[in-house]
């Protein structure tokens, strides 16, 4: 974290610097001009994590400033959603005078939504007992007069849900509303308004698609649910069990009838498609019946492994969302041999940082 860089007055200049840097880095691939999707300059993060500092009777949130090499008190946090900032103030006022809730509390995580829900996770260096549960329930009841809130307690090998461990986000994407179950301690897009722009861009660049869609690394179904309208059928893979369960919930909540999720890694799915191995999880699924002219990938920061990249390269159209321009560039070194870049986008998920979320559409030469 670099607090000095978090100045809304300099946001536009910082974003322009990212655009120039991105275009220069990918010039060898003859990309079209970068389409830039800006963030709000403040209150854009829907989740945040803070360490807790105990100083006598005082208790406060802090983060570590890597530039100053010191901890910085955070009574409010400019990047965090308005809802998180409101909860920060209300929560700390309740924790300070409560010995049971503050004892050995070392971290607080917030997960908020545009739909008005917020989940608060309290992390401890001690085991949680019945007294903690009673006090946490009273805390939830008091906060519920102001917030649509749920509270989770965590300690080593222990997790206590007072009600539920997820929120349901509601995103307005073009003329449709999509509901997404987001589970505590699982990956979600941190910048909801930019996430909407990403979905709208992906829908737009695939709107004339033919056949079916294959998606790897689908998470909670964020993209596949929104893109299902553009394809006959969608087949998606995801390895993390909580994400697969959330995806199944989201499919039903959004009434999607043409999307099937398979719980397996991209690497294993590549082996299955190449008929190198058979998998019990694929019993009853006729992979050969899918006519996937388009593949969608949103890999982790490490990018796509060589075997999966070879699979991806076999498709006519490749829609690639990347959270790491360096590994995207490495993957494009291979993909560019057979495909050309027809769409290029920068999504500013992480203002005031060097991180860049990008989108690329490739079509076979």
Swiss-Prot record:
Lineage: Bacteria, Pseudomonadati, Pseudomonadota, Gammaproteobacteria, Alteromonadales
Keywords attached to this entry: Methyltransferase, S-adenosyl-L-methionine, Transferase, tRNA processing
InterPro entries: MeTrfase_TrmA_AS, MeTrfase_TrmA_CS, SAM-dependent_MTases_sf, TrmA_MeTrfase, U5_MeTrfase_fam
Pfam families cross-referenced by the UniProt entry: tRNA_U5-meth_tr (PF05958)
Entry EC number(s): 2.1.1.-, 2.1.1.35
Coiled coil: none
Function: Dual-specificity methyltransferase that catalyzes the formation of 5-methyluridine at position 54 (m5U54) in all tRNAs, and that of position 341 (m5U341) in tmRNA (transfer-mRNA).
Record GO terms (molecular function): rRNA binding; tRNA (uracil(54)-C5)-methyltransferase activity, S-adenosyl methionine-dependent; tRNA binding
Catalytic residues (UniProt): 323 (nucleophile), 357 (proton acceptor)
Similarity comment text for this entry: Belongs to the class I-like SAM-binding methyltransferase superfamily. RNA M5U methyltransferase family. TrmA subfamily.
Protein name stated in the entry: tRNA/tmRNA (uracil-C(5))-methyltransferase
Record-linked SUPFAM superfamilies: S-adenosyl-L-methionine-dependent methyltransferases (SSF53335)
Keyword set includes Nuclease: no
Enzyme kind, highest EC tier: transferase
Reactions catalysed according to its record: uridine(54) in tRNA + S-adenosyl-L-methionine = 5-methyluridine(54) in tRNA + S-adenosyl-L-homocysteine + H(+); uridine(341) in tmRNA + S-adenosyl-L-methionine = 5-methyluridine(341) in tmRNA + S-adenosyl-L-homocysteine + H(+)
Gene Ontology CC entries for this record: cytosol
Membrane spanning residue stretches: none
An annotated GO BP: tRNA methylation
Annotated S-adenosyl-L-methionine binding sites: 189, 217, 222, 238, 298
Species of the source: Shewanella sp. (strain W3-18-1)
């Amino acid at each position: 974290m670099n607090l000095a860089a978090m100045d809304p007055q300099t946001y536009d200049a910082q974003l322009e610097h990212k655009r120039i840097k991105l275009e220069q880095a990918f010039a060898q691939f003859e990309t079209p001009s970068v389409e830039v999707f800006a963030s709000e300059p403040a209150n854009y993060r829907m989740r945040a994590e803070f360490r807790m500092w105990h100083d006598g009777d005082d208790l406060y949130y802090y983060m570590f400033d890597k530039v100053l090499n010191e901890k910085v008190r955070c009574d409010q946090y400019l990047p965090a959603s308005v809802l998180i900032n409101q909860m920060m103030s209300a929560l700390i006022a309740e924790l300070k005078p409560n010995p049971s809730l503050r004892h050995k509390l070392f971290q607080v995580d917030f997960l908020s939504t545009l739909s008005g829900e917020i989940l608060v996770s309290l992390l401890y260096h001690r085991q949680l007992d019945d007294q903690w549960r009673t006090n946490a329930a009273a805390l939830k009841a008091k906060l519920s007069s102001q917030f649509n809130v749920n509270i989770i307690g965590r300690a080593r090998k222990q997790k206590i849900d007072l009600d539920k461990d997820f929120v349901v986000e509601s995103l307005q994407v073009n003329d449709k509303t999509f509901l997404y179950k987001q589970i505590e301690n699982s990956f979600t897009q941190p910048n909801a308004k930019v996430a909407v722009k990403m979905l709208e861009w992906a829908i737009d660049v695939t709107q004339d698609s033919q056949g079916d869609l294959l998606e790897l690394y689908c998470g909670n179904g964020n993209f596949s649910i929104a893109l299902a309208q553009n394809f006959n059928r969608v087949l998606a893979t995801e390895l993390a069990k909580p994400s697969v369960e959330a995806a199944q919930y989201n499919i039903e909540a959004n009434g999607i009838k043409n999307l099937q999720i398979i719980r397996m890694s991209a690497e294993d799915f590549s082996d299955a498609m190449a008929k190198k191995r058979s998998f019990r999880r694929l019993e009853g699924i006729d992979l050969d019946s899918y006519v996937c002219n388009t593949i969608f990938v949103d890999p982790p920061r490490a990018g796509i492994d060589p075997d999966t990249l070879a699979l991806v390269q076999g498709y006519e159209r490749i829609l690639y969302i990347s959270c790491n321009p360096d590994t995207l560039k490495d993957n494009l070194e291979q993909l560019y041999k057979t495909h050309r870049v027809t769409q290029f986008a920068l999504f500013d998920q992480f203002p005031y940082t060097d991180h860049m979320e990008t989108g690329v559409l490739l079509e076979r030469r």
